[in-house]
Amino acid sequence: MAERGSDIRPGYVLEHNNALYLVVKIMHTQPGKGGAYIQAEMKNLKTGAKQYERFRADGDIKRAILDEADYQYIYGDDSMLTVMHLGNYEQITIKKDILGDKSIYLKDNMVITLLSYNGEIISAKVPDYVTLQVIETEAVIKGQTVSSSSYKVAMLENNQRINVPTFIKSGDKIVVYTPDDSYYERAKE
């Protein structure tokens, strides 16, 4: 679908130079002389390579139309995942690296979204918010928040380390915001 360059947003998938690119970041620029343009950081969905591209704000871009379908994660190994379509219960096997570094969030029976283009699966997304248990945290020293940060490092059940507020203890369940791998809130019981 053709759109204007000024319509580009992070998360869009563009057809550019006979390949599909995911727009990661954008920056609108209005130089003193000449027309406005958009500087986009993009990721090639097939190779994973990063690329920077300029688009004229009034120029045309071609946005790819992707099909989204929800699948339930059943099981996996080091390189492959088996998932089941929630509508027709068809099971398929996909490469684990299609999730990239977000595969650490996979849990049994988790619903993930697979994105396909012309019948070929090109990308996958985990939910934006995932609840995980804290396995280990650093001890908090009384008065620590006065002189330093009010965050400490916690090890989660998926062996990931993230910064959490000092009131989080080992055994607590927290919600992690997966797009930037950050603490969101303490899980509600």
UniProtKB/Swiss-Prot annotation:
GO terms for molecular function: translation elongation factor activity. Signal peptide: none annotated. The keyword Hydrolase does not apply. Coiled coil: none annotated. SUPFAM superfamilies: Nucleic acid-binding proteins, Translation proteins SH3-like domain. Keywords: Cytoplasm, Elongation factor, Protein biosynthesis. Pfam families: EFP, EFP_N, Elong-fact-P_C. Pathway: Protein biosynthesis; polypeptide chain elongation. GO terms for cellular component: cytoplasm. Gene3D superfamilies: 2.30.30.30, Nucleic acid-binding proteins. One of its GO terms (biological process) is peptide biosynthetic process. InterPro entries: Elong-fact-P_C (IPR015365), NA-bd_OB-fold (IPR012340), Rib_uL2_dom2 (IPR014722), Transl_elong_fac_P/YeiP (IPR020599), Transl_elong_KOW-like (IPR013185), Transl_elong_P/YeiP_cen (IPR001059), Transl_elongation_fac_P (IPR011768), Translation_prot_SH3-like_sf (IPR008991). Involved in peptide bond synthesis. Stimulates efficient translation and peptide-bond synthesis on native or reconstituted 70S ribosomes in vitro. Probably functions indirectly by altering the affinity of the ribosome for aminoacyl-tRNA, thus increasing their reactivity as acceptors for peptidyl transferase. Belongs to the elongation factor P family. This is Elongation factor P. It comes from Ehrlichia ruminantium (strain Gardel).
